[in-house]
Amino acid sequence: MKILLSNDDGYYSDGIQALIRELSIKHEIYVAAPLENNSAGSSALSTRKDIKVDNVEKNHYVIDGTPADCVHIALTCLIKEKIDIVVSGINMGANLGDDVIYSGTVAAALEGRHLEFSPIAISLITKDVTNLKNAAQASSYIFEEIIKNKTINKKTLLNINIPDSNNLIKNFEYTRLGRRGIPVPAKKIKDKNFYNIGAAGDPEEKGKGTDFFTTNNNIISITPITYDLTNSIILKKLNNS
């Protein structure tokens, strides 16, 4: 299978390099990843600037742009072969609940929504690289299981979160997104006209069946996410009112 790998932490980050090593054992790997960290960059496209692309080795591109830029340019211009699937990660840090709105990891995967297989975003619930090899092996195992599952609609993105563990985790559950509370307020830097964005809110909707609950119980969470943001229930009520 031909896989395009991307991320938001940058090409030289430990997470994507671990995933390259693991998935290249069985698959043909192409890489298009940002030059710099673009965490929380969401689905931004750089439409107001020229974007520099460096071909650092065969089928590996380092792009001075956003995660979405990377996958968009790779699929529409750089890579002539037919790519089967986009996999984004391994992100160092969780993408649970509302995090997916801001996530550059999820956004990179989302750019692969028109391919044969559902795009996949993978995150490790820690910024510590100690257990990254276990996470990469778990990612490879889950990837193979997903590809074998013919019931997954290719118009769905799969958001995977892997608990941090000293052991290789293979147990996984399909979950729904939880929900975070109000984020920590932005903070002004003393005596300067600069501000820092506050931390994400604590989980509020974290009951059984959510990604929060599942990962807290040391089980890998796989959340199917649809691209259609329409609230169909409200739409139906409005049309019938």
Provide a role label for each language-model segment.
Residues L5-Y12, D99-V100:
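Short, glycine-rich nucleotide/cofactor-binding loops
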